[in-house]
Structures are given as C-alpha cells and as structure tokens.
C-alpha cells in the first residue's frame, strides 16, 4: 500500500545532525527520531568502534598474518556503518505516515474502517526498518567478535 498521501515533504537529516541536536530532538515529544533511529545510531557507533580496532591493528608487524582479514573486516564495517546511518533516516521516513495515521478521524464507520486499513499498512511499514536494524546489528556483532579475536 502506498502511504505517500499522508507524508509531508520534510528533510529529516538526523544522520547528519550533531550528537547534541539528535539527543535533544530524541528527548522531545517529536515523533522522530525514535527508538529505531537511536538503535541505528548505536549500530553505526558500534561498527565505528570495530573499525577503530581494525585501524589500530593494520600495519603492525605483530598482526601481519591477519592484516588482509582486518582490511576485509574494515570494508564490511564501513558498509554496515553507512547502512546504519541510512537507516536512521529511513526509520524516520517510515514512521511519519504511522504518526499521521494515529490522528485520522474515526467518527463514522467508514472513517474507522479507513483508519484501520491505513494503520495496518503503516504499522507494517514502520516495523520493517527496526527489523532491518536488528538484522544489521546481528551482522555487526559477528564482525566485532572477529575484530576482537584477531585485533
């Protein structure tokens, strides 16, 4: 179901805001960012920390035997980090229609039915990004464990 009709054109930009700005908006009553965006941010920070281990490991004689593997891990973490940052924005985008759907009128039976239909579609869409964030977190954990074992 296309929910574009209840979206407003508004640039989010949460992934490029300062930490202070993000946390201030997160702590407000604004509908976004929310838990999904915060989770994606934590995922990006976690992968960045894994990459830090990789950066501190490559180029050292002591770790020469795992250097190629570390570069490959860093490459994978770089991509996950980008994915997480994108998911901050994506979570806000998919939550906006749900937020608006909550405010739909429900006076008549037709309005109630329409709201229920829109809510179901909006809920499915809004849940898709947190699910993707969880999947990416599982990928990141595997990489972090490998960084820890080799770095």
Language-model features: where?
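Conserved phosphate/anionic-ligand binding catalytic regions in large, soluble enzymes, centered on
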Residues: 28-51
